[in-house]
Amino acid sequence: MRTVFFGTAEIACPVLRTLSEMPEVNLLGVVSQPDRPKGRKLVLQPTPIKALAARLSLPCHQPPNIRRCEATLGWLEALDLDVIVVMAYGQLLASSVLEMPRRGCVNVHTSLLPKYRGAAPIQWAIWNGDAQSGVSLMQMDEGMDTGPIIATQSIPIEATTTAALLHDHLGELG
């Protein structure tokens, strides 16, 4: 299956790693947010996904705005994709991108949708004292985590569970 992965944050690395190991997936490249300055000295750092893509010898595009980057859009179009997999990318995809792959775009989201759409679902689950959280796989549409849910997998949240611990568990679960 001809596939491109969209992601930026560390939490998405296990999903990219898993896709790269699946024999039925022909992983053709990665799209990530641009590198950003970090630390006191504001040294430009690659995103965790870009760093992993380099270790996996995958090309990585980093458009500031995926909706307006003709080079990245042309590259994606030329790949004749079956699917785009997205996790923690940080930009909404335009309908032109959503319609490129034959089987559409799927998003891995760290909440039990429809609860906690958008940013910070892990923190909201902890803040609200939820008894469980999980990961949802959804078919993407133009909204923020609003497409049809394909599958979910839940895990309990214990009284001692921190946001950092839940983050790590959900990243692996994805």
Protein language model annotation of sequence segments:
Residues 1-174:
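One-carbon transfer enzymes
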